[in-house]
Amino acid sequence: MPRRRVIGQRKILPDPKFGSELLAKFVNIVMLDGKKSTAEKIVYGALNVAAEKSGKSHLEIFETALDNIRPQVEVKSRRVGGSTYQVPVEVRPVRRNALGMRWLVDAARKRGEKSMGLRLAQEIVDAADNKGTAVKKREDVHRMAEANKAFAHYRW
């Protein structure tokens, strides 16, 4: 542990189109090789397609999809006397958002549609309807935590 003062998290500017910090963070996660304008085109295009398909507003469908992906608990490995236990721990809000967005992008990249924009749009629509690969990932993590609830007293 460092002995100096704790450094706060950097403030990130809200995205120019919707004024949402969460969406700006999402654009940064989609971005590859520092190509932010390309990432913005992909995300905004995906949100347009998703909004058309669902009939909801852009931000509303994104928020709904993210809510359905964010994990509440996860498991962390903890070594106790020679054996390793998977200990369920609650996920902090900042990490919850980060994991949800990362899982959403990973699931979209593994899909079969033509362009990344379409893949992302379809994954957002699926996540908003509580189905899709990203939601399945969250369910798997929750199932692991539930299965290892007996080791919850090893929390640190």
Curated annotation (Swiss-Prot):
- SUPFAM superfamilies from the UniProt entry: Ribosomal protein S7
List GO molecular-function terms, semicolon-separated.
rRNA binding; structural constituent of ribosome; tRNA binding
Keywords (alphabetical) are: Ribonucleoprotein, Ribosomal protein, RNA-binding, rRNA-binding, tRNA-binding
**Taxonomy, superkingdom:** Bacteria
Membrane-spanning residues where?
A: none
Task: Please indicate if the UniProt record lists rRNA-binding as a keyword.
Answer: yes
Q: Which GO terms describe its biological process?
A: translation
* Gene3D superfamilies (UniProt xref): Ribosomal protein S7 domain
One Pfam short name: Ribosomal_S7
Q: Which GO terms describe its cellular component?
A: small ribosomal subunit
Query: What protein family does this chain belong to?
Result: Belongs to the universal ribosomal protein uS7 family.
For this protein, the record's PANTHER family field holds: RIBOSOMAL PROTEIN S7
Report quaternary structure and partners.
Answer: Part of the 30S ribosomal subunit. Contacts proteins S9 and S11.
Give a short account of what the protein does: One of the primary rRNA binding proteins, it binds directly to 16S rRNA where it nucleates assembly of the head domain of the 30S subunit. Is located at the subunit interface close to the decoding center, probably blocks exit of the E-site tRNA.
Q: State what protein this is by name.
A: Small ribosomal subunit protein uS7
Q: Which organism is it from?
A: Pseudoalteromonas translucida (strain TAC 125)
Gene that encodes the chain:
rpsG
